[in-house]
Regions:
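Structural motif
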Residues: 29-30, 86, 159
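Glycosyltransferase-associated regions of secretory-pathway enzymes
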Residues: 34-145, 163-295
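Flexible, charged surface loops at secondary-structure boundaries
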Residues: 21-28, 80-82, 152-154, 272-273
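Small-residue hinge/turn detector
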Residues: 146-158
């Protein structure tokens, strides 16, 4: 990619080598690393003798933010429960590991009065969206549910959880609002970290329909592994979402700070307070095994 440009929010950024970037440094610059594999970049910078005091990764910032992340209270929009007591989750690919099975059983123990729905290729039409179908046929399971979970919540209402979420407390108090989600350590909303809504919520439909405009398989045959966070941000930014880890309502959706889900996945950091409903461990099934092993 060196020599090409990366387009972000309509701005073009030239991609250069680390050596060239250091040459452009006038001594007043700070390098902010946004890549997941920030440790490797640190190593490369140190080889060139770069002043590491002027270098930091967004993941380390997120780790520090998680320690102070907070919000006043869960929002109540009604005296009556609005979101139905339904918990949805998805599983594609091989048989669920025992750890995942035990985790789901733990949900059921905490929420005996909830209805649980497992969605997979036997009870859901994965061909109804091109992006989802391409991810399924490519066996890149971590992307298959991105469209599906929005479609399910829009149609039936309830709460969606990724299977690598450990529930800390029963989510009853979350049911008195029309729609909720949370930020994660990327400082933007992550629907994989759990979200809920009443059926027919407009913002859920818009987030779902966005996937009709993108493909998972690029024209050159490579995979479009843009995260669901980035896809969601493309929708939410036009409604004024702020990247600040603060509780905010965006087009009817209450988005809670990252402490709501208690984890900074890229640094393997967990922090739980009385404001944490569950921990999203983020097994990052969409990330290559090689990079996960390095971390």
């Amino acid at each position: 990619k060196i020599g090409s440009e990366y387009i972000c929010d309509g701005k073009a950024f030239k991609i250069v080598s680390i050596k060239e970037a250091i040459k452009c440094d006038d001594g007043n610059s700070i390098i902010l690393i946004t890549a997941i594999d920030y440790r490797s970049i640190y190593n490369q910078l140190s080889v060139y003798g770069y002043d590491m005091q002027r270098c930091i990764s967004i993941d380390e910032i997120a780790r520090n933010q998680l320690e102070i992340s907070n919000y006043s209270d869960v929002i109540y929009e009604s005296k009556d429960k609005l979101i139905p007591k339904k918990i949805h989750y998805a599983w594609f690919g091989k048989e669920k590991p025992d750890l995942i099975k035990k985790n789901i059983e733990h949900w059921k123990e905490l929420c005996p009065d909830y209805e649980f729905y497992e969605w997979n290729d036997t009870n859901y039409d994965i061909t109804k969206n091109k992006y989802m179908k391409e991810a399924y046929e490519s066996k890149i399971w971590g992307f298959v549910s991105d469209y599906m979970r929005l479609d399910i919540i829009y149609k039936y209402g309830g709460i969606y959880l990724d299977t690598d979420i450990e529930m800390i407390k029963k989510p009853d108090e979350l049911l008195y609002q029309k729609c909720f989600a949370s930020f994660d350590a990327t400082f933007v909303m992550n629907l994989g970290s759990g979200f809920g809504a009443v059926a027919g919520m407009d913002i859920i439909k818009e987030l779902r329909d966005y996937y009709d405009t993108v493909s998972f398989v690029n024209k050159d045959g490579t995979y479009n592994k843009t995260s669901c966070n980035s896809h969601s941000y493309n929708v939410m930014k036009k409604y004024g979402v702020k990247v600040n880890d603060r509780l905010q309502n965006v087009h009817g959706m209450n988005i809670y700070p990252m402490i709501f889900q208690g984890a900074c996945g890229h640094t393997n950091t967990i922090h739980v307070t009385n404001k944490t409903f569950w921990i999203h461990y983020g097994n990052l099934s969409w990330m290559t095994r090689e990079l996960k092993n390095e971390q």
